[in-house]
């Protein structure tokens, strides 16, 4: 269930290392953990940043994976 999709970061708390992405297809917001961010720099996201990601079912429901800033 890891098809690539795009969306905008709804919010991200860099101190806690998680936030939510709003998919562009109108589906439900998706949880994102900093460990899913593909970056060699500090792994953080900013509000309204466009990202590409996949979705996998985690222990607490759907979660973004392989998150890449566009």
Curated annotation (Swiss-Prot):
Leader sequence residues: none
Subcellular location(s) of the protein: Cytoplasm
UniProt cross-references to CDD domains, sorted A to Z: CSP_CDS
InterPro entries: Cold_shock_CspA (IPR012156), Cold_shock_domain (IPR050181), CSD (IPR011129), CSD_CS (IPR019844), CSP_DNA-bd (IPR002059), NA-bd_OB-fold (IPR012340)
GO cellular component, one term: cytosol
Protein name listed in UniProt: Cold shock-like protein CspI
Keywords: Activator, Cytoplasm, DNA-binding, Transcription, Transcription regulation
Ranges where the CSD domain occurs: 7-67
GO biological process: regulation of gene expression; response to cold
Molecular function terms from GO: DNA binding; nucleic acid binding
Pfam families, sorted: CSD (PF00313)
Gene3D superfamilies from the UniProt entry: Nucleic acid-binding proteins (2.40.50.140)
Superkingdom of source: Bacteria
């Amino acid at each position: 269930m890891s098809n690539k999709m795009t969306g905008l970061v709804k919010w991200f708390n860099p101190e806690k290392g998680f936030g939510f992405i709003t998919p562009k297809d109108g589906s439900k917001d998706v949880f994102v953990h900093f460990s899913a961010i593909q970056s060699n720099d500090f792994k953080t996201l900013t509000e309204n940043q466009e990202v590409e990601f996949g979705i996998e079912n985690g222990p607490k429901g759907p979660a973004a994976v392989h998150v890449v800033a566009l």
